[in-house]
Design a protein with these regions (language model features):
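Short, well-formed alpha-helical segments that are part of the catalytic scaffolds
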Residues: 16-39
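Conserved donor-nucleotide/metal-binding helix-loop-beta segment in metal-dependent transferases, i.e.
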Residues: 84, 105-129
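N-terminal nucleotide-binding beta1-loop-alpha1 segment
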Residues: 1-16
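Conserved alpha/beta core of the MobA/IspD/sugar-nucleotide pyrophosphorylase nucleotidyltransferase superfamily
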Residues: 161-256
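Short beta-strand-to-loop acidic/aromatic patch adjacent to the donor-nucleotide binding site
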Residues: 91-101
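Anionic-ligand binding region
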Residues: 133, 141-166, 172
Length: 256
């Protein structure tokens, strides 16, 4: 079984332009993410999945500089990009991350791969981690089926193809560690205030190497004023996700 981490990233962004290239402590957001993802032990490789748009050439250079693979595909059809990348690298299972989430937890990437080995699930979500730290797992065979049934070419938000069709074995990896279990914290970067919070976390915790998620949670619990920085963004984030999660299928689907 061959697995990989896919980093979904483009420089195109409406709410916070070129956010993956914003710098903290001398590194871009996406480079901090790559550094963290390298801590995962089970994936066979890390692939930066970006678009063929010339504006994303800079991301190709970042991948080369940081010693990871890169694949370029359709700018808007993310599922198509995933499928072609999975074929190119001959993968069986992928763990999906986003380039604007520098705190993605490598421990739960390994847990997700182990969970897949136990269940052979088509689609795995992670329940309990803060927004911006969890991932999704996809069996490549299921990804190919999803690409066959989708009726849209813009699949930036794609989870519904797996969860709403009734065609896939959907499983949930639940977080049992009470220290990091916290779904009320938002650590993704969608708005300027999000970036200010992330920057403050790095300023306090980053000493030249990756710091664990537990330290981030501890910092935020001990300093509740930090969560006030992007408090208003959480509702915007949730509303935007709900707006984008509707998906269209080519034909009616049936539960197996």
């Amino acid at each position: 079984m061959k697995s990989a981490i896919f980093i979904t990233a483009r420089t195109k962004s409406t709410r916070l332009p070129k956010k993956v290239l914003l710098e903290i402590k001398g590194k871009t957001i996406i480079e901090h993410l790559i550094e963290r993802l390298k801590m995962a032990k089970l994936p066979d490789l890390i692939v930066l999945c970006t678009s063929t748009n010339p504006n994303d050439d800079v991301l190709v250079e970042i991948a080369k500089k940081n010693g990871i693979e890169c694949f370029r595909g359709n700018e808007d059809d993310v599922l198509d990009r995933f499928e072609k990348a999975a074929d190119f690298f001959n993968l069986d299972f992928i763990v999906v991350t986003w380039g604007d989430e520098p705190f993605c937890d490598p421990e739960y990437i390994d847990k997700m791969i182990d969970f897949y080995k136990e269940t052979n699930a088509d689609y795995i979500n992670c329940e309990g981690l803060p927004a911006g730290t969890f991932t999704y797992g996809l069996k490549v065979d299921a990804l190919k089926r999803a690409c066959e049934i989708k009726a849209e070419t813009d699949t930036e938000i794609w989870g519904g193809y797996f969860t709403e069709s009734g065609m896939f074995d959907v499983r949930t990896l639940k977080v049992e560690d009470e220290i990091i279990k916290n779904s009320n914290i938002t650590l993704t970067i969608d708005y300027p205030e999000d970036f200010e919070l992330v920057k403050e976390i790095f300023n306090r915790l980053y000493k030249g190497k990756v710091f664990p998620l537990k330290e981030i949670i501890k910092l935020l619990k001990e300093n509740p004023e930090l969560q006030e920085i992007n408090k208003n963004c959480q509702e915007l984030y949730e509303a935007n996700i709900k707006r984008l999660t509707k998906v269209k299928f080519k034909k009616p689907t049936k539960v197996k």
